[in-house]
Amino acid sequence: YRSSLPDYTLPEFGQKGLCARKLYHPLIKDPVANSVTLTKGMLLTGSNASGKSTFLKTVALSQILAQTIYTVPADSYQTDFYAVYTSMALRDDLATSSSYFMVEIKSLKRIIDAGKEKKHPVMCFVDEVLRGTNTVERIAASTEILKSLAENHIFSFAATHDVELTKLLEDAYENYHFEERIENNEISFPYQLCQGRANSRNAIRLLQMLGYEEALIQRAEKRASDFIEQGEWSK
């Protein structure tokens, strides 16, 4: 396997958190490598298709490879041994009549319970926290669930579109984001991990690029701007 990698390193264990240099996903052709140093969890924001989910998968896969075959696709990788849990790519379950939201909260509770057992240090990866419910309850519940993960010393990597969480949880998590570039009415993604919370939005701009009516675009932009300024939706 090592001979199939363009570059790899032998992991170093004994350090709490994670220090990775030029970490990349081994299954992606011409991958963009990223470096990160963390002593507490990461809250990851960014627009659609900017690279959030891929980064979570990269770290999760690297941790598993480090602990199993002592090989990591990176220049250097320092961490500790963790029980790795994920809450990603979930689906509703018709066989058990479980809605998407029910599957989500069961998945997250299993991670919290693992941390409370204190059998092993836990590292977890959560993609789009509680996206299966309404905005108000999603932000309220996500805040408390992510706080609980941190309080139970679970080393968490969580991706979200809810920028509000970056302020509510800034004492418990490090904020990182991915950006997009829009030039000549085309969007591109550099896939470079950046520190801090995301400040840009691209959903309405994508509607414009796909030819939606300009009047519709302007009304949507005004609604978004009004909400940001006033904290409530206009009719």
Regions found by a protein language model. Give the residues of each.
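ATPase nucleotide-binding head domains, primarily ABC-like/P-loop NTPase cores
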Residues: 7, 11-235
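Transmembrane helical bundles of ABC transporter permease domains
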Residues: 1-6
